Amino acid sequence: MNFKDEKTGRIRSHNYNLDYIFQEGITWTALSSGNFGARYSKQGKLADSKGSMLYLHNTKNTNYALAFLNSAVSSHILKVTSQTLDFKPGRISELPMKIEDNFFEMITSLSRDAVTISKNDWDSFEVSWDFERHSLLNGPTMQSS
């Protein structure tokens, strides 16, 4: 069988980004009726067509980029440029992120803290892969819980 596209010569149904799979990145829901929201994605995850993934060449910028993508500035730009319910990777890649050296450490630290708080909150629910026990049972004794 020939799995190549007759027009382009590329093999169909093939992952062209093998260098990036399972790498740390930023993901977002591509289809949303609400505001754009980006999430940190740790190593070991795959992207999909409605859960796109942004990979940074320099991973030390990941939390800075995550903070920018979740900012009011990005939200306003995306409301103008993505007037449908679909947040496509091309639109996200066109956002004008500028790294400000004077604020880099502070923004990165705040973003990292927000990711930790969100993860801890998510992990308190049974649907999380990292769920251990309900937060109501976190007291030192069952009686204090």
Model regions: which residues?
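S-adenosyl-L-methionine
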Residues: 1-145
